[in-house]
Amino acid sequence: MEELEKTRKILKTSFFIAVVTVAVLFAFPYDLKPKEWEIYAGSYFITTLGLTVGGATIGILLGMMLAFFKFQKTKNEVVNMIKDIIIDEYVDIMRGTPMVLQLLILSVVIVIFNNYWIAVIALGLNSAAYVEETVRSGIESIDKGQMEAARATGMPYRMAMNEIIMPQAVKNILPALVNEFITLFKETSVVGYISVMDVTMNSKSLQAAYYSVKPILFTGIIYYISVKLFSFIGKRLEMRLKEND
């Protein structure tokens, strides 16, 4: 069984290398000038990756806060009901409307930031809705008896959540969080609608300048390799967490 798994990994890696090699040979934009390569690299590393990291940071922090507030109950039932309705509606609005539409609305509403930071905020607010649902399901997957036992020993609710429930929930939801990061990475391709020059928008400009589809095809390869890398890192983190159990 172990030998079969090793063979599968070798074949999978070989296939990936073969696909990328053939794709690069046919799609590599050899005609690009050094300055154009510099701009292209900046549109990927600074814009696309920058938007992804910024949006993911906002999304994870805000999403976890929303999930935490959803579970934290007060003695006032009316306050609890209003709080839950607000969080639920926020999640429904963000999940029920297109990312492009949210981006366009924020670009009109928020005028104190440039479009790059508006894109970061829009991506983060959208991601937070999905992270909240993911974290909520992760917390609900933990046996309720653990919280009850912690509370019975006199541990405050917040401490019990931070030290007992959340560490276990994070292990359960890590694959879903990695998938959300990958989804966010691909969703950055819509920021061109508010004139942010990400790698997709840049490749479209190069395609128009050179009358060639190669810049767009090459960008597709870049996305493919990036997603493979993110997935690999996510799996390694998951394995590391399991080893520490």
Predicted regions, residues:
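Transmembrane alpha-helices and adjacent helix-loop boundaries
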Residues: 1-245
